[in-house]
C-alpha cells in the first residue's frame, strides 16, 4: 500500500471531525518540503548576502524549517495514534530520527507530484 493509500484508508476510517487532522499530514509534508527548499536556497546565497544579512537569512529560514518539521512530525504521530485507535495500518513505520520523518515528508510530496492529474 502506498503512503497516500494508507492516508486515504485512515481518512475513511476516522470520524468526520478527524479527517482534517489526517489531511494535515499531506499538507504539512508539503509545507516542510517547501521550507527545506527555502532554507537550502538561503544557504546557497544566490543573492550574495554578506555577514549579518546572510546569517540572519539562514537563521530565519532554518527556524521556519524546524517549525514546519515539528508540525509534520506532530501530524504524523497523531495520525498513527488514530490508526491504532481505528484499527487500520499506521501511515508511518519509519525510524524515530528527524531525518527519517523528513524523508517520509518528501516521499509523500513526491507521490502526490508523480500521481497528479
Regions from the language model: what does each represent?
Residues 2, 24-27, 67-70, 74:
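Short, well-structured alpha-helical interface segments that form or flank functional binding sites
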Residues 14-33:
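Short, charge/polar-rich alpha-helical segments
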Residues 115-117:
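Short acidic DE-rich linear segments
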Residues 1-18:
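Extreme N-terminal leader/activation tails
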Residues 8, 16, 24-25, 42-44, ...:
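Intrinsic-disorder/low-complexity peptide segments enriched for small residues
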Residues 34-103, 107:
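Acidic, low-complexity, intrinsically disordered interaction modules
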Residues 1, 21, 50-51:
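Generic structural signal for short, solvent-exposed loop/turn connectors between secondary structure elements
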Amino acid at each position: 500500500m502506498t503512503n497516500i493509500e494508507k492516508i486515504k484508508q485512515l481518512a475513511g476510517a476516522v470520524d468526520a471531525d478527524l479527517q482534517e487532522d489526517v489531511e494535515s499530514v499531506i499538507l504539512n509534508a508539503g509545507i516542510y518540503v517547501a521550507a527545506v527548499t527555502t532554507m537550502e536556497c538561503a544557504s546557497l546565497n544566490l543573492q550574495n548576502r554578506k555577514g549579518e544579512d546572510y546569517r540572519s537569512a539562514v537563521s530565519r529560514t532554518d527556524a521556519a524549517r524546524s517549525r514546519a518539521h515539528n508540525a509534520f512530525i506532530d501530524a504524523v504521530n497523531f495520525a498513527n495514534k488514530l490508526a491504532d485507535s481505528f484499527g487500520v495500518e499506521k501511515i508511518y513505520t519509519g525510524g524515530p530520527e528527524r531525518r527519517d520523518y523528513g524523508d517520509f515528508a518528501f516521499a509523500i510530496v513526491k507521490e502526490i507530484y508523480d500521481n497528479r492529474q
